[in-house]
Design a protein with these regions (language model features):
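Divalent cation-coordinating acidic motifs and surrounding scaffolds
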Residues: 1-167
Length: 167
């Protein structure tokens, strides 16, 4: 099973051709620790739509409505008011240029201590205004961070994680 299959769930009996509403939130670590990988992470976010549509075509499934949102974070304690930002949900492909502009505006800075604020940003992503309409819905959160451990609370997080909420 591919990562895309895991994110979108398996197709049940008789589900071929069912349109799916998909919301994706990218949570991106924008601290200095991402200096060597931030461009790759941004490119991954920007190319995700095309890869998703290719996969859906192969699976004989369609996306009725695709929305993508971005939450970037640094360190709430260290960076204060410059610790995060979040976009609205961009309707794709209609708002692809606005999505690209938001993602390209992310730059690495700040941080300065561990842990960074990945759990807070993940919490913000989980409180997003996810789509509620449609026969099939998929709510996906993609977390990109270089800080894998919250030493204070002894919590381990995979550096690149897919969290799927399906309805």
């Amino acid at each position: 099973m591919t990562n895309m299959q895991e994110m979108l769930g398996s197709m049940g009996e008789g589900e071929e051709g069912i349109a799916t509403n998909v919301d994706i939130v990218f949570v991106i670590d924008a601290t200095r620790s991402m200096q060597t990988t931030i461009d790759m992470v941004k490119e991954s976010a920007l190319s995700f739509q095309d890869k998703l549509y290719d996969f859906m075509d192969e699976a004989k499934r369609s996306i009725n409505n695709l929305r993508i949102k971005v939450v970037w974070f640094r360190d709430f304690y260290y960076d204060g008011n410059y610790a995060y930002d979040e976009s609205k949900f961009f309707e794709l492909p209609e708002e692809k240029e606005e999505f690209r502009d938001f993602v390209n505006g992310i730059h690495e800075a700040g941080g300065g201590d561990d842990p960074e604020s990945g759990l807070e940003a993940l919490s913000m992503a989980m409180r997003s205004d996810f789509v509620q309409e449609g026969e099939k819905k998929r709510h996906i959160i993609v977390l990109h961070t270089s800080c894998c451990v919250d030493n204070k609370n002894d919590i381990n997080i995979s550096c690149n994680s897919f969290l799927t909420f399906a309805h």
